[in-house]
Amino acid sequence: YLTSSETLSDQAYKFDFSHQSEYWELAAEQQYIGKDFRADLGYMPKADFTQSDIAADRLFYGDDSSFWSQATISGQWQIQHNTNNELIARSLSSSFSIDGPLLSAFTLQLTHAEKVGLRHNKTIDAIDGNTTRFTENQLNFFGEFDPLISTYASIEVILGDEIDYQNDRLGNITEIIGNITWNASKHLEIDLYHTFSQLEADGRYVYKANLTDLRVSYQLNVNSYLKLTLVYSDVDENVNNNPMVDVSNIEKYLSSQLIYAYKLNPQTVFFLGYSDSNYRDDFLTQLEKEQKTFFTKISYAWMP
């Protein structure tokens, strides 16, 4: 904390370069955020770093007889230090993406990265000699398509190394993220997401997590709609493989929200809603309601 006689003052800058042509897209960025720089009127999640990025894309185009319309081969290099020139992270990635029929798009990416873990002595800011450096190799696949005119589906798969920051060690991640959006009618839209994530280290799992997010919207008319949101998470943390932290073996959450919205005019919307949350851990045998809320608000979009 600062005393009344102390002040913070530092500098920040960012340079961007981009070039686009029919077959090439090039980009470069240099950013510097001083250790004592603060952006009180803007979002600044971290300071004390300098970062360089270089990216290049080579584009290819299909002809009338091809099943694909466009393909891209990409490469990106990134490096980040603190302002004392101590390495925080650097990575090199390459990817291949292709656009095909049914509004489909697929991307395969390989990433090699070096990153530092937690500081061994948290009372000092030094990175060199005070952290462990880890090497990550990851494979990422993303695919999306519209099997029907009213349906969108996507899947993302992440496999490979990932730092277990809670325990300052290298682990192995398996993560699958799926999404289906169905416009069931002119009024009804159903949007379902599910994420499965598992981290392993030292031959055993660290955690297994499942997250389901369901959103249902019903447009009553041009002025009003109903929206229901249900979010359920189930996290199983291995109490025998988290040596640096105390964890709960069972963590389950269920939250729900129902909102009615009515547009009074193009600038004003009235909301009426209900929300609740439920929780379970090692000390509970079932989901217990934590809180419930009834609320109303009026939103006005002011235009000068």
Per-segment meaning from a language model:
Residues Y1-P304:
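Exposed, low-structure sequence patches enriched in small/polar residues
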